[in-house]
Amino acid sequence: MLQEKESIKQANEFAIERVFNAPRHLVWKAFAEAERLAQWWGPAGFKMEVKKLELSPGGTFHYSMQSSDGFIMWGKFVYLQIVEPEKIVFILSFSDENGAITRAPMSATWPLEVFNVLTFKEHDGKTTVTLKGHPVNATEEEIETFRNEFEGMNQGFSSTFDQLDEYLAKLLFDHS
């Protein structure tokens, strides 16, 4: 039964990995400090604002992203585990401006909560960031919606990681 549950979880798990040409401590700071996150988090073309960032178990990252046409989306992480500089475990949700969990603006059947694990591994001065996520407390319909959006999530996180790549390159250039 446990093995069956594990294989179901894996089938419903989104994963993306990126190697950044920067040391792990800098990549970690880009995820851990509000002023750094505001420089790169979210899709290209969106203006990011950090309302709150408390990187500790039970803490939150509450933010908004505004598109060029003025559309605003709110999101929230609730941190479950922080192992600096190796791992961040959190629940990701769409939210309103007060931090209350809401439905995704693009889908009425998107899961309300997505469990995520971010890992940071350094090798030869480069850092591999791996993100894995799966719905929690979700209906079958929400799980199916999540699974059907793997390609879109891959594009979205690739764009976000492109911005992180640019941010880190600028940071390293400015300090060289």
Where are the language model's segments positioned?
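Hydrophobic ligand-binding cavity/cleft-lining segments
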Residues: 1-47, 163
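Intrinsic-disorder/low-complexity, polar/charged segments enriched in Ser/Thr/Lys/Arg/Asp/Glu/Gln
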Residues: 11-17, 24, 60, 74, ...
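Short beta-edge strand/loop motif at the mouth of beta-sheet-based domains
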Residues: 15, 35-78, 175-176
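Short beta-strand segments enriched in hydrophobic/aromatic residues
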Residues: 20, 65-67, 94, 133-135
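Hydrophobic pocket/interface hotspot
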Residues: 27, 37, 61, 79, ...
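Hydrophobic-ligand binding "helix-grip"
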Residues: 51-55, 62, 69-124
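Beta-strand/loop substructures that line and gate deep hydrophobic ligand-binding cavities in soluble
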Residues: 100-155
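Short, highly charged C-terminal tails/helix-capping segments
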Residues: 166-176
